[in-house]
Amino acid sequence: MAQTNGEMEHSKESPEQITNGNNQEVVQEDDGAGGLFQISVKLPHEPYKIQVMVSSQEQVQDVRQSIVELPGTFQYTCFHLEFNGKRINDFVELSEVPGLQADSEIVLVEDPYTEKDARMHVVRLRELLGAAGDRVDTINGVNAGLSLHDSIAAEAGSEKSEKEHSLAKYDIPGSSSLKTILPRSEAPAPKTVKSISLSPWNPPPHHLRQKGHLLYLQVTTNEGEQFQITSHVSGFFVNKCSNSRFDPFPKTIPKKGSAHSLLNLISQLSPSFDAAFKELQESNNQKDLLTTFPFQNSIPSSPWLVAPPASNSLQTTKELPRETVQDRVFRERLTSKLFADYNEAAARGAVLVARGEVAPLNPTEAQDAQIFVYNNIFYSFGADGVGTFASEGGDEAARVAVGKDVLGIKAVNQLDINGLFTPGTIVVDYMGKRIVGQSIVPGIFKQREPGEHQIDYGGVEGKDVVATHPDFVPVFEKLSKALRIKKHPVWDKDNQRHDLEGSVETKGLLGTDGRKYVLDLYRVTPLDVAWNEEEDGDAYPHRMSVLRLELVESYWRAKMSQYVKAEVERRRAAKAEEAAKKEKSSEDTESKEEGSEEKSEEALDQERVDISGFSLALNPDVFSGQIPQTDEEKEQWAQDEKEVRDACDFLRSKVMPELIQDLHDGDVGFPMDGQSLSQLLHKRGINIRYLGKLATLAKEKGSRLEALSTLLVQEMVVRAFKHITNKYLRNVPAPFAASCVAHLLNCLLGADVNATPRAEIDSSLREIYPEGDFSFEKVTPEALRAEIEKQVTLRYRFNLESQWFNSLRHLQLLRDIAIKLGLQLAARDFVFTKAQAEGLKVLPVANGVNGTGQDEGSKKKKKNKNGDSGSPARSAAAEKPIVTFTPDDIVNIVPLVKDASPRSSLAEEALEAGRISLMQNQKQLGQELILESLSLHEQIYGILHPEVAKLYHQLSMLYYQTDEKDAAVELARKAVIVTERTLGVDSADTILSYLNLSLFEHASGNTKVALAYIKHAMDLWKIIFGSNHPDSITTMNNAAVMLQHLKQYSDSRKWFEASLSVCESLFGKQSINTATILFQLAQALALDQDSKAAVGKMRDAYNIFLSQLGPEDRNTKEAETWLEQLTQNAVSIAKHAKDIQARRLRRINMGTRTTLGTQIQPQVGQSTADVSAPSQASNSSIDSRNIDELLKFIEGGDTSSSRTKQKKRAAASNPKLRGSKKSSA
């Protein structure tokens, strides 16, 4: 996007003052590279001229967008640009505009409005002026795209005292308030107008439309005056209408009553408008721009907790040229935008379908078999309405199949195979229903000639009829090669053989537009035969349990590695006799290379091995009912089956145990919630159905993986509850969805408060829905627990413990349930246990979602104690039993969207090239490529996108490592905001982004701000996981070190102690991790003037290092040195204190009791040296000099001994550094 120097004061200066005189030279030098240069834009109104920084590769529409968003040119929305008197096409690049160069002047010319333009202008101004109000959005829900970054930073900046910091009085083991993830209350923005709305006289009659009337508006200014305004093709003017008289023609008023922009017209009508609008802009500028930036190419995150209350275009992009980099940028940018637009439109339509607001095309069919077309998008239910999946598991199989189909289409879109097209596809889960939305493939509804199949390639009617078409072979061959699919035979119902490139379930359709479409990609990988054959007890709900694409890729890499090693061994054996000396020399060379380049010998051999002879592909149709006919076919089929079995065995014997071991050893980041756990499993190629097996493996590892075991069990319970809730929600009338969810949540999470909850249903409303399914009313806590246990056993083959519901982490479970069902709950302190419910005699929230029900209840109780009998309504409310959730707590249910949008391959290629260059020590080239990747990410995705957040995060770490701290902080800040808005204010990624930002802020000298970020991250951690997360050890250590930097030694000590407590519980008291923290804690205790405790902790650290690492290890030696020094100082201080105590006793005998105990113990911020200052010279050999040296020793000050300096350097760097690394385990 074009860059502007949009400050108002700049635009008032002359162009000569602003323009860089060297720009012309820069343009000439960088012409080929699309260098930046500056042009002027002449405006019809103030400020009459602005300067815009542009690139020759940008399009004119980018310049347009910059003008629309610039504060000084807000009023322009309907205009075109001219250069040398000729209109410029918005969609050409600036380099294609004849004669345009640095310092050229283009002219903005206002255009006549259409009704669309007028409406867009009014909507834009309502948003700019803060008069838009809250729009009900069925897709994004309440507070979608929320960011808390600015309020966290503001809280840190509000600490006035030097000794104030965010972690003061922080309760480390305590619970976190739910307010942590709610938007902070803000002062209301300055009001510019009271209202802008459509007039009751709108729309204009036909005869006035012919005269150019577009809309009639009604504006009420801050002064209280009401104006009726006509939107005309020429602009806006005040008309003669009143509330009772229609006369939409211009009114003669003292002031000028017309303008091309509504903004300018309001400015003329309201004397206070300009000042109020300027104040509003200043208020908005206090926020980070990213927190208010509109979403373009991604769906914003909808928080689970809120404050109480087009087909052809998708295919056309694939046919765009891709020869040059600019072609690819334009193509991927357009693809990203079109997918985002399609996904949003499809999701909105899916919600309407789920709500029953779209008429079906086949209303006489059963509900699950009904199909819909809305907004040119084809919708159906993810259920087996016509019996297609009858043998695979019916509705369960159909639901899984459509989810797998989206993943398959996404993989094909990512491969971007020339000549192969996919329909735009989206799956939406909403109110228990799964809806599939697809762009209509041209020809899919076409009636074929007799004898012709509806499908041109693949299975036509299940597997009974198989079609082949030579045109599909080349494109399917490319697809199969990329996805490791083996070409194989299948047989139809007549046992006729057909050779297919893909699964028989994958279909090819030749569209009437001449394009080749691939459909039904839910079986691009083989069935997990090991899982299907392992059934004991009730059968798994469906037979769609396939392997993940990530696992197939991992298996391929493992087999390739085996092939390379075998090839190397074969070569060595062949050459061993004839070239022993040469081989020895070669091995010597290899060993040198191994030392210098840190590469394994196998990797070097691998570089020399030609892997073109290696091939591995899996047959996706084995174990799915195919019957080979000849002996040769049977033999080949048996080999295919063996290969698939080996892949399944690879998952169970290699991948899953490796993951558990990596988590045990701390080699991977520990998951925090269900979302991060699922991402970790999917990345490794592990299906969610293996949660039970993983839980068993984790339990075998003991207490170190107790947190993982808890998380795995919680995830199984949440997913079982989701399936149960969806079953009830599916047929519940929409007005009762909140009652259904609240009742089921009460049965799961509120049974301790009320063992017999009853569903809250409006009986008069219920009568309107005689066919509604209200079976959820009959659910009891006991029945729900039994059903959850059954579902966990059925789906995950894991048996929950008998009292599993007593060990639930209620808030974390509620959060995961809300996220998986799309619930948005009213924020309040939910009552989960009897202890919390004690004293509550009334319903916690009786009248709404304000989150103040408990406070109101307590006030009512106080009044009753004082003799106030209360109203009859209040008495009735008091008789209601206490329940944890009421229907009013369910503020909204948002749709959960699974899309098939591809990532940008160009941006990822640039990023990967940059990383490789940096690894090769080509720093300048690497940074240029990474910055290019950043530019591509922002151009293609827009700024607000999860992929851009990920890149900001990676780049911030890169800049931090290269010691460019300011850039690191800026990018980390952007990463936080974009992550909050796209993934959620309390997502695991948001926590990691805040922790990163805190480290960078501390490194930049902003330690107080860093502590505010750590405090917020710790609060988020408590909400999404609870206390004692394994990765929190490092965070608490970092907080302690930062507090030491602020000389807050007492607080620092508390955080080290908290870190030690978590570490001991996870790794045991004799682990090296524990010893490292003990080492740091001993230093902190010395700084806090607790010499005796410091000696004890250092001795513990030394003993652990000695037993675990031996006496010669560097850690052991350093701990021993510190122990000697601390012991020496502790003895001196104790001796000193004993002498002072003796003098104090003598004073007591002489009757001077006033000083007893008042100055012996050091106060906060006071050293022992201060206390012992009155001592006599006779004590000089044991005075406070040693403790001062110790303080300097720990803090890095100078001492007289060079030996002490060496010890100091080693201790100040190595143990802490190693400690932070190990503790992160």
From Swiss-Prot:
GO molecular function, one term: mRNA binding
Database matches in PROSITE patterns: CLU (PS51823), TPR (PS50005)
Subcellular location: Cytoplasm
Cellular component GO terms, alphabetical: cytoplasm
InterPro entries in the cross-refs: CLU-central, CLU_dom, CLU_N, CLU_prot, GSKIP_dom_sf, TPR-like_helical_dom_sf, TPR_rpt
Disulfide bonds: none
GO biological process, one term: mitochondrion organization
Sequence segments annotated as region (Disordered): 1-22, 577-605, 846-878, 1153-1225
TPR-type repeats, residues: 949-982, 991-1024, 1033-1066
Ranges of compositional bias, category Polar residues: 1153-1184
Keywords: Cytoplasm, Repeat, TPR repeat
Domain Clu: 281-532
Family: Belongs to the CLU family.
Oligomeric form and interacting partners: May associate with the eukaryotic translation initiation factor 3 (eIF-3) complex.
Entries under HAMAP family matching the protein: CLU
Function as written in the Swiss-Prot or TrEMBL entry: mRNA-binding protein involved in proper cytoplasmic distribution of mitochondria.
Record protein name field: Clustered mitochondria protein homolog
Organism: Emericella nidulans (strain FGSC A4 / ATCC 38163 / CBS 112.46 / NRRL 194 / M139) (Aspergillus nidulans)
The organism's taxonomic lineage, starting at the top: Eukaryota, Fungi, Dikarya, Ascomycota, Pezizomycotina
